[in-house]
Amino acid sequence: MDLRQFLMCLSLCTAFALSKPTEKKDRVHHEPQLSDKVHNDAQNFDYDHDAFLGAEEAKSFDQLTPEESKERLGKIVSKIDDDKDGFVTVDELKGWIKFAQKRWIHEDVERQWKGHDLNEDGLVSWEEYKNATYGYVLDDPDPDDGFNYKQMMVRDERRFKMADKDGDLIATKEEFTAFLHPEEYDYMKDIVVQETMEDIDKNADGFIDLEEYIGDMYSHDGNADEPEWVKTEREQFVEFRDKNRDGKMDKEETKDWILPSDYDHAEAEARHLVYESDQNKDGKLTKEEIVDKYDLFVGSQATDFGEALVRHDEF
């Protein structure tokens, strides 16, 4: 096995290698927390800072003077105002908050983009992705590595075609993001459900029964008793997952399980920020209204810590 094959196998095996038989595998795609801080504006605005900027970027604003914070906040506002009409709406603010919280996704896409846009034309074709990902292992397969690369490639191609909205087999940056992180896009959620069901549905009848459901998240270790969480999951399946009580989950029931429609924290925070900053109560914010409430959005220190501090200038 050459180095490329080894690295590919390593990446595929990592999740399995780190798992223990009694550990629970979580199939549910959770929305990330906006902040791990308590949301109490009467004490401080730390939660709002984390939500608006992302936790790491919020730390960099703590190093700035009020004047510097206002200047950088003004630049951010221009980016939030998508339609450039001079106002920031709840929807635009919600979109920004979601972007700030999911910046790691964009960083992952940028990293992978460089390795797959082989001709550097600002697009990634299916052929480029296939050659970069599967070229070596398909040309010289190792029968002992335990992976069916042709099957994996077929599955990747199906997902790529789903992400590729115009059907030209060439992905833009946005389409490539949908391919790599389909759970983040509404139009990709069916493929997330389909792939999940294919993984779990061992008898290929198009449903997930109780034993398949438990078998996916728990590997029985010899004669050991089942952990309590496994018993709880059995109860969850019967009481909540299998909504029509037919002993198995269909596509809709599986979708409700792995892609729950939880409370939208980003929208709640966006509405809160608009409510607190909207001086003329027209339901949207101007740059001036946002900068006037800079302490709510980004905060700052009252003093300049000097040149010794390393400041991040992503914005």
Swiss-Prot record:
Residues that bear N6-acetyllysine: K165
Binding site for Ca(2+) 6: D278, N280, D282, K284, E289
Swiss-Prot/TrEMBL keywords: Acetylation, Calcium, Endoplasmic reticulum, Glycoprotein, Golgi apparatus, Membrane, Metal-binding, Phosphoprotein, Repeat, Sarcoplasmic reticulum, Secreted, Signal
Cellular compartments annotated: Endoplasmic reticulum membrane; Golgi apparatus; Secreted; Melanosome
Domain EF-hand: 68-103, 104-139, 151-186, 188-223, 229-264, 265-300
Subcellular location, principal: endoplasmic reticulum
Domain of life: Eukaryota
Gene Ontology terms, MF aspect: calcium ion binding
Motif segment (Prevents secretion from ER): 312-315
Glycosylation sites: N131
Binding positions for Ca(2+) 1 per the UniProt entry: D81, D83, D85, E92
Binding locations of Ca(2+) 5: D242, N244, D246, K248, E253
Pfam family, one: EF-hand_5
Signal peptide residue numbers: 1-19
Amino-acid positions noted as binding Ca(2+) 3 in the UniProt annotation, renumbered to this chain: D164, D166, D168, E175
Recorded family membership: Belongs to the CREC family.
Subunit and interaction comment: Interacts with GGCX.
Function: Involved in regulation of vitamin K-dependent carboxylation of multiple N-terminal glutamate residues. Seems to inhibit gamma-carboxylase GGCX. Binds 7 calcium ions with a low affinity.
Listed name of the protein: Calumenin
Organism: Mus musculus
Gene coding for it: Calu
